[in-house]
Regions:
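Regulatory and interdomain segments flanking nucleotide-handling catalytic cores
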Residues: 1-4, 8-197
Length: 197
């Protein structure tokens, strides 16, 4: 156990030092929107294999990165929801009246799906099928990432709000507000219109 503690301490010290050094590469004088995703990527690279819980009585199956990313996403959604509903006394709303807040539908799980165009992937000739299949799959993945980044930009959110993306699907956690719903509706119409043209 003593040697495990020593290895763990050295590992965490190395991660902390690397984190400190990498933070110097980010220009914090710019608006937060310009560096938040870089910060998120840096955090993912360093904290994916660090458990969020240090308790030896718990199974360490959730990474510090995933825990922190989801916490940031939910915190951002709560802030947006409260702001949209004209609530500025956060302490009262979230701590003193927490039971009431838990009953509110402050969050929305949003799914984006482009897998309906799978026919595009699989209508290929036998000659060079594998190469064509890979290229079309890659194209759809890049297309999904582009759509996702555009949507996040319109919603003024970071990639922290992405719960899952892959295989032509993605899931986002969003604030359940009229403004969010309107933005989603406008975005869906624009993307569908672009795809039809």
């Amino acid at each position: 156990v003593g040697s495990e503690m020593c290895i763990r301490d050295r590992y965490y010290s190395a991660v902390k030092e690397k984190f400190r050094n990498l933070l110097t590469t980010i220009d914090f004088s710019k608006p937060v929107e310009q560096y938040v995703n870089s910060l998120l990527e840096l955090f993912e690279g360093l904290c994916t294999y660090i458990p969020s819980s240090t308790s030896t009585k718990e199974v360490a199956d959730i990474s510090l990165f995933d825990h922190s990313k989801l916490t940031a996403a939910f915190a951002g959604c709560i802030y947006t929801y409260l702001k949209a509903n004209g609530i500025s006394d956060y302490k009262t709303e979230l701590f003193k009246n927490s039971e009431k807040f838990y009953d509110k539908k402050a969050f929305m799980l949003y799914s984006l799906d482009i897998s309906g165009i799978q026919k595009f992937i699989y209508t290929i000739n036998i000659q060079g099928a594998l190469k064509t299949l890979r290229a079309r799959s890659f194209y759809l993945e890049i297309f999904m990432e582009h759509i996702l980044d555009e949507l996040l930009d319109k919603l003024e959110l970071s990639r922290a709000n992405i719960i899952y993306t892959g295989g032509g699907h993605c899931y986002l956690i969003l604030a359940n507000t009229d403004e969010t719903k309107q933005t989603l509706d406008e975005f869906e119409k624009a993307v569908n219109g672009w795809l039809i043209d």
